[in-house]
């Protein structure tokens, strides 16, 4: 089949780029021709103002060189024209948080396709989309009904997490079990795509460093500056005493400003970003796809989970040291949903990592076996491959 992928592929964001790449490569590995529909949102352009200029160009270069793209689209009309020209046999939506916003004219619910007399017969399915919001009840009855009507026309639906499944079923289908399949993120399969890639180590030794991703200018102002600096000094001391370097893998928005032994400079290619995580002794820090990449690679990890409940109540619980109670409030977090029920459920804190024990986190990372991380990965991939086989069968009928 010739399959079009409609997802968030353009953002200057490592995870967005890699999930599109992994979906494309997986479909190709199953014998299909896969192209990423180059739909550009206003938000994609906005990233240019938010990230380092060199890093923005690195993401743009990756998308335009590594992804098999269609012509560019910015409207529903463009999408219809491109799909007709490409003569796709099927469209897949996702992965990533493409089902979170009512402000995109239901592009990612394929309303534009279902309304087209010429295209409405093309089968549509989803690959691990997520909602990552407060639900759909804030939308008007008409908006919710329009989304429901679209979903009823999908041939096969998977979502990335339990929160998205429960939210759709509750808010759009009156608690009916309409969505039943939770599908792991495509980036779990990324390790399969790097066998021919060469890591630009910049003088670092494989498994000779701990890797961290912290917020931009983490301790350069705001609250708890002294506590952040002390936490970092303590964690770095544990890492160095054990014989490792502490290396920063900066987020696209900017470097942390902390005194790492080494900071990977921009520009960072998304595949090189993955290889830095793969070759680390352990990873500690921000971002969902950094954690999925660590799992894909068998790298021990600890998540600085900024996606959870950041209410004042949760922050107070963390400041008081009541971390376990605070983490039970994170049901919307994609890290919470990723790790829930696994042996790694406790391998996360919220954004206030400075109130956690640096010694405890270091010990958790040192005691984690790569074999156990790989077992967790392989369980997720087994689910992913089962769902993908069912999805491909559904859209081929």
Each model region followed by its residue ranges:
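Active-site anion-handling motifs in enzyme catalytic cores
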Residues: 1-397
């Amino acid at each position: 089949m010739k399959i079009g992928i409609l997802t968030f592929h353009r953002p200057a964001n490592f995870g967005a780029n890699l999930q599109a790449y992994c979906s494309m490569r997986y479909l190709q590995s199953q014998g299909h021709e896969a192209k990423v529909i180059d739909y550009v949102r206003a938000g994609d352009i906005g990233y240019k103002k938010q990230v380092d200029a060199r890093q923005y160009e690195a993401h743009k270069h990756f998308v335009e060189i590594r992804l098999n793209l269609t012509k560019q689209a910015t409207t529903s009309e463009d999408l219809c024209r491109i799909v007709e020209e490409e003569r796709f046999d099927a469209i897949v939506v996702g992965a990533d948080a493409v089902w979170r916003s009512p402000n995109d004219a239901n592009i990612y619910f394929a309303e534009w396709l279902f309304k087209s007399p010429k295209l409405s017969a093309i089968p549509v399915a989803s690959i691990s989309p997520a909602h990552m919001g407060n639900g759909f009840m804030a939308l008007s009855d008409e908006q919710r009904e329009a989304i429901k009507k679209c979903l009823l026309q999908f041939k096969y639906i998977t979502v990335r997490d339990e929160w998205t499944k429960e939210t759709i079923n509750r808010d759009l289908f009156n608690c009916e079990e309409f969505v039943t399949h939770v599908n792991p993120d495509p980036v779990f399969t990324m390790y399969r795509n790097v066998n021919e890639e060469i890591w630009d180590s910049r003088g670092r030794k494989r498994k000779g460093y701990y890797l961290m991703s912290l917020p931009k200018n983490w301790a350069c102002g705001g609250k708890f500056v002294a506590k952040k600096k002390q936490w970092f000094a303590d964690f770095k001391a544990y890492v160095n005493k054990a014989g490792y370097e502490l290396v920063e893998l900066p987020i696209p928005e900017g470097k942390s400003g902390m005194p790492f032994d080494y900071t990977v400079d921009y520009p960072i290619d998304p595949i090189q970003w993955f290889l830095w995580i793969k070759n680390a002794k352990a990873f500690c820090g921000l971002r969902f796809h950094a954690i999925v990449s660590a799992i894909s690679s068998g790298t021990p990890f600890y998540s600085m989970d900024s996606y959870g409940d950041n209410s004042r109540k949760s922050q107070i619980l963390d400041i008081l040291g009541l971390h376990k109670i605070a983490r039970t409030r994170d049901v919307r977090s994609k890290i919470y949903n990723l790790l829930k029920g696994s042996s790694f459920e406790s391998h996360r804190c919220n954004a206030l990592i400075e109130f956690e024990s640096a010694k405890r986190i270091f010990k958790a990372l040192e005691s984690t076996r790569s074999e156990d991380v790989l077992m967790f990965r392989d369980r997720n991939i087994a689910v992913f491959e089962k769902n993908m086989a069912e999805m491909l069968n559904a859209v081929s009928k």
